[in-house]
Amino acid sequence: MSDRYQICVRCIMDTSDPEIDFDAEGVCSHCRRFEEVGRPVLERVGTPEGKRSLADLVERMKERGQGRDYDCVIGVSGGVDSTYVAYAVKTRGLRPLAVHCDTGWNSELAVKNIENIVTRLDIDLRTFVVDWEEMRDLQLAFFKASLANCDIPQDHAFLAALYRTAASERIPFIVTGSNLATESILPRAWGYNAGDLRHLRAVHRRFGTVPLRRYPTLGFVRRYFYYPVMRGIRTIPILDYLPYRKSDAKRIIREELGWRDYGGKHYESIFTRFFQAYYLPRKFGFDKRRAHLSSLVVSGELTRDEALREMGTPPHPQKELLEDKEYVAKKLGISVGEFERLLALPTRTYRDFPSSVALFGLKDRAVAWYRRRSRLRESGPARAG
């Protein structure tokens, strides 16, 4: 982190991101990347060409789904993005198979939201239950490693469960809730790549105690070669094809599906709520709301002043955060005192452990080159992985 504080003049990202940089006008690297990568995609949404791309995509999914029970796989967590994805695909006549990955941390509200989604939309649901002892040990390993992204064990399992289900059910499309309108900004230092299996295994090898025999994993080659090339599975970020505003999405799913709000982004998980609202700000000085709100600023849903006002409020009530800390410690099988000791350890970064960061960087550059060659406006915003 820089000793000299600076905040972007366009969004609200600042030097709490140790890898941020600013141009001569004070515009940050995240904003510049959004202008290069995100804005062309979002400006295409709703245009005649964009509408045609969406219609063609839906038609292709229906054609590939002929003779099968389902056209696509979707993940459901009870959160806004995944709930709106379920609504969007179902109202367009697609037959999704919903997959929920139960890592042991669902809030009651998340469970109720999922029940409402699948019931009201008449969607089949598969629940993938992760072995708790392995999940607990892996999450503890990340706390012992003193890394910023202690949510990797959950996020990696979610991803692996989607691909496993698509492959086992012979479903050629995974429709995800990742999107540029609300998620274009996330510093790598705050949330290193959950898809990096080499990194996950390196952390567990050093600090874990329970063998990962049933925990679902997804390696680089399997994700970017075996599944898309050998099995023909394509990942579709459908919200990048739609006009997507967080506030409008919440209103629609409340009215149509009986969805109930759970607070902050990804707070449907008790662990993630504690991780984002307590662990990251206290231990690292990272407040992920800054990235989430900056994403809404650059996409035009919020003004910069509105985002700054939101940052002036606590991420979650203090009393509830302390209750969450006790709950997380107890569920992980350690005392609050031992948990406090782990939280007080000197911080490390993902660079302190083996990873495939160079390989993912090469992949990203190859994708960027391909998009430039094929002209993004012709190929649409679909992603390969």
Q: What label would you give each PLM region?
A:
Residues 1-72, 88-385:
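Nucleotide-activated chemistry modules centered on ATP-dependent adenylation/adenylyltransferase
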